[in-house]
């Protein structure tokens, strides 16, 4: 994980977040970049790809039953919100959050995203971590899953970086 202050001192930004984060860092905005690999490790550590594959197995992309998809999307969101991160990952997140110099009120969002999940946090950062997982769960909202099925023919998605910024 990389703070925007570290980025301003010359660390490399993730390529899929570089433009926005470099601008914010140059402006002196405090913040934290959670790399896509952190989300990927969460999915792998919780065996989520297999659980999600089994959950969505009844859905056929060629003939989507939206009535069947809706409760599955809700279950997927709950699965993301309730799956635990590995202890080492949680501690890494808390340490990075402490280094970021963020105020107590933050927004957790994707780079380029217009909206995010708000959090009022205090050390160690549990509320910010919960907001991060709520944001990740948005990828499994009915509309998001339906859009992936329509465009890619699959519910699968790629991990992406996440930003924590002052509100």
How should these model regions be labeled?
Residues 1-166:
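N-terminal beta-alpha lobe that positions the nucleotide/phosphoryl donor
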């Amino acid at each position: 994980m990389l703070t925007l202050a570290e980025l301003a001192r010359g660390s490399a930004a993730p390529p899929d977040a570089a433009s926005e984060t470099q601008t914010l860092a140059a402006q002196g905005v405090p913040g934290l970049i959670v790399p896509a690999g952190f989300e990927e490790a969460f999915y792998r550590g919780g065996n989520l790809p297999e659980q999600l594959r089994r959950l969505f197995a009844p859905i056929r992309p060629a003939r989507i039953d939206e009535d069947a998809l809706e409760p599955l999307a809700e279950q997927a969101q709950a699965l993301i919100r309730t799956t635990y991160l590995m202890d080492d990952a949680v501690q890494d997140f808390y340490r990075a959050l402490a280094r970021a110099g963020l105020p107590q009120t933050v927004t957790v969002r994707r780079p380029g995203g217009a909206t995010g999940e708000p959090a009022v946090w205090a050390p160690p950062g549990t509320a910010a971590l919960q907001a991060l997982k709520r944001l990740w769960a948005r990828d499994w909202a009915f509309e998001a899953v339906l859009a992936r099925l329509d465009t890619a023919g699959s519910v699968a998605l790629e991990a992406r970086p996440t930003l924590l910024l002052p509100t």
